[in-house]
């Protein structure tokens, strides 16, 4: 039986030839080329992301101003449900009726019922604001004094 350069017979060499590494498989130049290509691809990706981020930041400043201006132009019917503003220096019938949630021409019984309902929810002894309780009582007194029985 003839032996090959690997020290095996020719039939054994043919049998195991697919498992034996070739002379240049895994050489350092191939690894360096693959690593270099990968590093270049990663570098280009980082550079592209940086340029895209810079472009986005440049667009955001004027776009933010446009968005803010358009948001101011939008009508807010849902926000107009609540009364905007504080209390006036001297309470009038309109403000008193807004506080109690009744019409300015409501009867005394409706005013008392609304006052009772609001004071139960906002009594100072149960954690409510003393200032708000004072304003609620002032509104009740004003509406009752100007309303006919």
From Swiss-Prot:
Keywords: Developmental protein, Membrane, Mitochondrion, Mitochondrion inner membrane, Protein transport, Translocation, Transmembrane, Transmembrane helix, Transport. GO terms for biological process: pronephros development; protein transport. The chain crosses the membrane at residues 35-57. One of its GO terms (cellular component) is mitochondrial inner membrane. It holds the Pfam family DnaJ. Its main location: mitochondrion. It is a single-pass membrane protein. Negative regulator of the mitochondrial respiratory chain. Plays a role in the translocation of proteins across the mitochondrial inner membrane. Involved in pronephric kidney development at the early tadpole stage. Expressed in the developing pronephros. It is found in: Mitochondrion inner membrane. This is DnaJ homolog subfamily C member 15. Residues 1-34 are mitochondrial intermembrane. It comes from Xenopus tropicalis. Residues 95-149 form the J domain. The gene is dnajc15. Residues 58-149 are mitochondrial matrix. Disulfide bonds: none annotated. The keyword Membrane applies.
């Amino acid at each position: 039986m003839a032996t090959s350069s690997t020290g095996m017979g020719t039939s054994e060499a043919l049998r195991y030839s697919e498992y034996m590494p070739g002379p240049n498989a895994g050489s350092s130049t191939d690894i360096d080329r693959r690593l270099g290509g990968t590093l270049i691809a990663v570098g280009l990706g980082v550079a592209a992301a940086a340029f895209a981020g810079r472009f986005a930041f440049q667009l955001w400043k004027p776009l933010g101003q446009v968005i803010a201006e358009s948001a101011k132009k939008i009508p807010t019917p849902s926000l107009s449900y609540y009364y905007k503003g504080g209390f006036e220096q001297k309470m009038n019938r309109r403000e008193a009726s807004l506080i109690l949630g009744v019409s300015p021409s409501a009867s005394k019984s409706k005013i008392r019922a609304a006052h009772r309902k609001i004071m139960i929810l906002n009594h100072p002894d149960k954690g409510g604001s003393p200032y708000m309780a004072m304003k609620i009582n002032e509104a009740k007194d004003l509406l009752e004094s100007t309303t006919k029985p």
